[in-house]
């Protein structure tokens, strides 16, 4: 399971000209599911995302996590994160989870974060989305479990 996380001052996702999710300070999480992913991996990754220290403390060091800064999550499914780009000029998605598996783990990821008290907005699974963000820093990390 892969999460490309970006520290944002604001982010939103639009489907069919309608804003369906938006946050201010927090993290934009692009979430990719791979074939071998499980609920256990999802919980480990969600915990890591929420606990990852990527916000600056009073000394300017990345020492604070999402909860410590009162931030929110915007979680957007992105199967292209599971692409194999090692050969040729066209990505292979053979390692990506099936749509049913990916939807289930995506929904469980969101529910897990919400159950931990984190304000969590979402995109729309499988939709053509326009994602806008102001990357604060920029600060971006690729987390994988």
From Swiss-Prot:
What Gene3D superfamilies would the database entry show? D-tyrosyl-tRNA(Tyr) deacylase (3.50.80.10)
Principal subcellular localisation of the protein:
cytoplasm
Q: Does the keyword Hydrolase apply?
A: yes
Enzyme Commission number(s):
3.1.1.96
Enumerate the UniProt keywords alphabetically: Cytoplasm, Hydrolase, RNA-binding, tRNA-binding
Supply one GO BP term: D-amino acid catabolic process
Q: Name the chain's protein.
A: D-aminoacyl-tRNA deacylase
Corresponding gene? dtd
């Amino acid at each position: 399971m892969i999460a490309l996380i970006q520290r944002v001052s604001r982010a939103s996702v639009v489907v069919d000209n309608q804003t369906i999710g938006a946050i201010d300070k927090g993290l934009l999480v692009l979430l990719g599911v791979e074939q071998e992913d499980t609920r256990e991996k999802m919980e480990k990754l969600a915990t890591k995302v929420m606990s990852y220290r990527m916000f600056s403390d009073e000394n300017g060091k990345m020492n604070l996590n999402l909860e410590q800064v009162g931030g929110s999550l915007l979680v957007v499914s992105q199967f292209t994160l599971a692409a194999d780009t090692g050969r040729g000029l066209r990505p292979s998605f053979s390692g990506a989870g099936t749509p049913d598996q990916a939807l289930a783990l995506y929904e469980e990821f969101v529910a897990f974060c919400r159950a931990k008290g984190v304000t969590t907005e979402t995109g729309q699974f499988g939709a053509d989305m326009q994602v806008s963000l102001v990357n604060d820093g920029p600060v971006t990390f690729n987390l994988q479990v």
